Amino acid sequence: VLACNDSFRAAAPGLEETDCIPVWMFSAAPQAVHVRWPHESAYSVATLKAVLGRYRDSEQAHDVMRQLRPIKEFRRQWFSSIEVSYGRDTSDLLHVRDPATGEPASYRLSVADINQTQNVLLLTAIRKPYSGPPI
């Protein structure tokens, strides 16, 4: 995470400790925030596989894997699936609970390249009325 607004930081408690969404996803906070944590963590692993395919020799890739490798649930998901994701369907809404109020919300996510090298991506989250599974 290079930059984000206050709303994103509030919705992702603890992210500032890692500034890395895949590492954050396997910490305690996201499991309380994400209504469908198993779905979101699997998506995170599939996306990480795609990114590591391109940047596997970078120091950042090695650092992320050093942090994730000791986590049993990450290893289970990594080795139990061949899923690779290069994007997120906009109909696949993110369902979360507000960390402060517990109020559920759904978000439509879109990811866009902001430069021609595809080294920096812009994530936009549009809040929608909650439409996830019953809580």
Predicted segment positions?
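C-terminal regulatory/effector modules of DNA-binding transcriptional regulators
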Residues: 50-135
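PAS-family sensory domains
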Residues: 1-87
